[in-house]
């Protein structure tokens, strides 16, 4: 991964523009555990968002897997996130109506894979949840939910794991177990962790990049990695199975009926007049 001169400014109504990233450049290896450290407002989450294709830069270039993602269309960015990236967030982002196994299977179904139960069981065993496949995620502890989120991120075999404050909602001991797990996976993948916890960053990070006011103020870069091939990869377009989409839609109707009906009405109008 090569990051060259990226900048990002947020324009806010009735307020001064906020410079989130200011001319940032660095290279990252193909494997290892990299921490992006900083206080609130430092730009660390914005950096993760632009590297993962969740947000766009105003200028600069980000080359990943042989492609400059700053030049990709929205559809191509979606394919990049689906194929190249795994995400782990503080809020877990699990679907409560689905079982543990179904939540993990969803990542494979979005890639068009079918009959992949063996992959789900294998990844559950790796994260220490081999007996939880049929459980509802609402029955799990915070640490167990985060392990499910990690399993979902890893099961599709992405190049990079992006973790934004993955231990923020956990107690210290549970947080350590989650970082131990990510550290183990970083032996074969690039794991990028955003955190404000300097102690965890120094203990677990192969490299710690610290931000303040949108700029890099320190970069340990103590460990030198071997950068292997940069061949261009083919990324898969996400495909959500109709039965899963229906289940999620029914759940949304249960909690937000008016919003869902309004969305359906507007969609019908759009398809009718715009095609």
Please state what every model-predicted region is.
Residues 232-270:
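N-terminal Sec/SRP start-transfer signal
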Residues 60-68:
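Conserved ABC transporter NBD signature motif
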Residues 98-106:
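Short coil-to-helix segment of the ABC ATPase nucleotide-binding domain corresponding to the Q-loop/switch region
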Residues 155-159:
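A short, proline-enriched helix->beta-strand linker immediately N-terminal to the Walker B motif
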Residues 161-164:
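Catalytic Walker B motif of ABC-type/P-loop ATPase nucleotide-binding domains
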Residues 136-140, 144-146:
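Conserved ABC ATPase signature
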Residues 52:
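Helix-to-loop junction immediately C-terminal to a conserved catalytic motif
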């Amino acid at each position: 991964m090569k990051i060259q001169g990226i900048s990002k400014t947020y324009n806010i109504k009735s307020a001064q523009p906020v410079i989130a990233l200011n001319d940032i450049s660095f290279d990252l290896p193909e494997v290892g555990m990299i921490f992006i450290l900083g206080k609130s407002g430092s730009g660390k989450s914005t950096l993760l968002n632009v590297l993962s294709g969740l947000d766009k830069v105003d200028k600069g270039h980000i080359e990943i897997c042989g492609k400059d993602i700053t030049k990709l269309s929205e559809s191509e960015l979606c394919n990049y996130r689906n194929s190249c990236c795994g995400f782990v967030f503080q809020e877990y982002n699990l679907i409560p109506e689905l079982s543990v196994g179904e939540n993990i299977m969803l990542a494979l179904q979005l890639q068009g894979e079918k009959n992949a139960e063996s992959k789900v069981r294998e990844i559950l065993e790796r994260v220490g949840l081999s007996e939880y496949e049929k459980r509802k995620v609402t029955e799990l502890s915070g640490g167990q939910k985060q392990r499910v989120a990690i399993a979902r991120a890893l099961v599709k075999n992405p190049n990079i794991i992006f973790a934004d404050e993955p231990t923020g909602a956990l107690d210290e001991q549970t947080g350590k177990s989650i970082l131990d797990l990510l550290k183990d996976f970083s032996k074969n993948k690039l794991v990028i962790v955003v955190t404000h916890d300097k102690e965890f960053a120094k203990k677990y990070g192969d490299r710690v990049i610290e931000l303040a006011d949108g700029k890099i103020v320190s970069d340990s870069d103590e460990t030198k990695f071997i950068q292997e091939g940069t061949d261009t990869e083919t990324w898969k377009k996400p495909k959500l199975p109709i039965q899963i989409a229906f289940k999620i839609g029914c759940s949304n109707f249960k909690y937000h009926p008016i919003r869902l009906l309004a969305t359906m009405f507007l969609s019908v109008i759009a398809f009718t007049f715009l095609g």
